């Protein structure tokens, strides 16, 4: 076997890149340290210098995976150059698309099997999950502007997140035949979420046509 000349400083990144490429097409359970060694032309002992075990590797994948997930969601939610309703719509739709495009990684991040590893890194209970913090902050922004009902922002964010997780799971696990209509289902779900969250004192202002068709008695 021809061994590649990897620098010590980038070998860990190479292992992670191979791991992410692998789980894009296959389940994390099928990833072995031997696969990493073969792909990089290194020995398994080289892997153990960076990861003490497969669980340690998976824990790092979870940590990096959540960072990637957050980069896909938070900038949209926190972009105050866009109106709040559009931010909600685009970010939450982005959540669905990210799950659909990364089903194995999504299951790894949010599934039950590796929950102990995940919970050793972050939790929505202590604000260490950055994407959830951004969602809750956007809910609070909406409350302060009078758009969203002034209720428990944590519970409101949980309702949004749970709805997104439910639809995402149905899509990626083919539990229901929704592949052809998931965008329509998402729009219907978004309208239902808005109906429960939006203050009755405002009319929604949005660049999204179907949102503007939700009538409220007063122009914001």
How should each PLM-predicted stretch be described?
Residues 23, 58-65, 109, 117:
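Alpha-helical DNA-contacting segments of helix-turn-helix folds
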Residues 60, 74-105, 160, 209-210:
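Hydrophobic alpha-helical connector segments
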């Amino acid at each position: 076997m021809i061994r590649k000349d990897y620098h010590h400083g980038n070998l860990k990144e190479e292992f992670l890149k191979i791991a992410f490429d692998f789980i894009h097409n296959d389940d994390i359970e099928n990833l072995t340290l031997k696969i990493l060694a073969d792909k990089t032309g290194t020995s398994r002992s080289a892997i153990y210098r960076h990861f003490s075990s497969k669980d340690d590797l998976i824990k790092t994948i979870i940590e990096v995976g959540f960072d990637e997930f957050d980069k896909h969601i938070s900038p949209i939610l926190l972009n105050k150059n866009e109106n709040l309703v559009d931010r909600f719509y685009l970010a939450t739709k982005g959540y669905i698309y990210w799950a659909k495009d990364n089903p194995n990684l999504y299951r790894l991040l949010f599934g039950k099997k590796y929950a102990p590893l995940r919970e050793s890194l972050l939790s929505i209970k202590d604000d260490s999950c950055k994407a959830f913090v951004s969602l809750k902050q956007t809910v609070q922004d909406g409350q302060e502007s009078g758009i969203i009902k002034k209720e428990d922002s944590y519970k409101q964010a949980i309702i949004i997140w749970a709805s997104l997780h439910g639809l995402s799971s149905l899509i990626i696990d083919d539990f229901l035949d929704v592949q052809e209509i998931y965008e329509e289902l998402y729009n219907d779900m978004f309208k239902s979420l808005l109906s429960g969250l939006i203050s009755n004192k405002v009319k929604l202002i949005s660049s999204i046509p179907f949102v503007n068709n939700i009538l409220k008695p007063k122009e914001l």
